[in-house]
Amino acid sequence: MKTVSVIIPYYRKIKYIKKSIDSVLNQKFKNFEIIIVHDDPRNKDFDYLLELKKNNNKIRLIKNKKNLGAGFSRNKGIKLAKSKYIAFLDSDDTWKKEKLKSQISFMKKNNLDFSFTSYDQIDSEGKKLKTVKAPKLQRYDDLLKDCRIGLSTVILKKKLINKKFKFSNLKTKEDLCLWLKLSKKYKLVGYNKNLSKWRKMKESLSSSTKQKILDGFRLYYKHEKFSITKSIFYLFLLSFNFLKKNYLR
């Protein structure tokens, strides 16, 4: 049995996926499996992923019959995982070599169910932009207005994910939606060690902003059952803190 299952949902990131996979394969900690969930049935990138998987029994490649989105693809990967711990990595992000060894050791030493770490923000070419430090703890009330948890820094015990606690079908904010649910029952503990690199991609500002606003409102109104007024209030706080964290140096 492997100690860690690394879940990577894949959707049209052919420029970066090899770097992401290599950053896992080059870990000092070796007792892991990689589960790549290919979420674009019409795209030919699957053949490229097969080549990357070739002759490597650490990699499992799953192909969705239809596009499920990143959240549901992660749920599928988790369900197939055979490890005690689950780690998440997006297909354009990377890890530092000591990531798994250091973070798993931290979790075992402190008997933790969930941890996240500090990370570097990098641009599309890999140039460092800034470092985002992990707070000691992310409580429910903190998360409502400012999420400091980088998805590709998270490791949690598989037992935490079930029918009640899993990723939603939101196109964005699906990770925050899960963190909020988990924070009501578990401690989400930060490890102030820089172990990951999060790639800040250039995207259509108008389309991405609209989607994030819609999903943010759905998060509070539909999933957290807030009133319209309360949902708008927290959406404003979350958006302000996101802009402050990601666009102000």
State where each predicted segment sits.
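Short, well-formed alpha-helical segments that are part of the catalytic scaffolds
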Residues: 10-26
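Glycine-rich, basic loop-to-helix element that forms the pyrophosphate-binding segment
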Residues: 64-81, 102
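The conserved acidic donor/metal-binding loop of glycosyltransferases
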Residues: 90-94, 118
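Conserved donor NDP-sugar-binding/catalytic core segment of glycosyltransferases
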Residues: 98-129
